[in-house]
Design a protein with these regions (language model features):
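Short glycine/serine/threonine-biased micro-segments
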Residues: 19, 77, 111-113, 135, ...
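C-terminal "cap" of GNAT-fold acetyltransferases
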Residues: 94-98, 132-177
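Conserved glycine-rich acetyl-CoA-binding loop
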Residues: 102-120, 129, 140-147, 151-152
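Acetyl-CoA-dependent GNAT
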Residues: 8-14, 18-108, 119-125, 129, ...
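Extreme N-terminal starter segment of soluble prokaryotic enzymes
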Residues: 2-5
Length: 177
């Protein structure tokens, strides 16, 4: 087994990233051994298609104003991070601020430190591309993620309702800077 390689995502990674994102979302938020959020199927499936379809991932990778990184071992994707212009609904948010959009680690790779490594890369990139604070939206029940972000200087700055179809997840808005 080779070491884990962390690198920028490429367009040809889109299909594998879409599969990893979908699997990680379902394992984390929907599965009985995850948070088991009872999303109605009518809300969940369109959200999954919109968020984790290969074409949507290709568009995000191609965005000039965003950064996208992945961790892989032996050609198998284990984790990824995506950052770009802030889109969180906070009154202090300004054009030029940056947001960590996603930080996903496959269930089989948790505990390897990949989330922390990808977060550090994303934060360096965000700092270099931001004219103001850095932002993260995190589900209110995901205490593990909140603890990781707090260890990197993020503090709760607000709350909002994140739409998954008509369903709403209660999210915290975190800010650093």
């Amino acid at each position: 087994m080779t070491d884990v390689l962390i690198r920028p995502a490429r367009l040809e990674d889109a299909d594998a990233l879409a599969e990893l994102g979908l699997r990680t979302f379902l394992d984390t938020f929907v599965a009985p051994d995850g948070f088991a959020i009872p999303y109605p199927e009518a809300d969940l499936q369109p959200y999954l298609d919109q968020s984790f379809g290969a074409e949507a991932v290709r568009r995000r990778i191609a965005e000039a104003a965003s950064g996208y990184w992945l961790a892989e071992r032996d050609g198998v994707l284990l984790a990824y991070a995506n950052a770009g212009p802030n889109g969180l609904p906070h009154p202090d948010a300004r054009p030029g601020d940056q947001e960590l959009r996603r930080l996903y680690v496959d269930k089989c790779a948790q505990g390897l430190g990949l989330g922390t490594k990808l977060l550090a890369i994303a934060l360096d990139w965000m700092t270099g591309h931001s004219t103001g604070p850095l932002w993260i939206g995190v589900w209110s029940g995901n205490l593990k993620a909140q603890k990781l972000y707090a260890a990197h200087g993020f503090e709760k700055a607000g709350e909002y309702e994140y739409p998954v179809g008509a369903w709403r997840d209660h999210e915290f808005i975190l800010r650093r800077g």
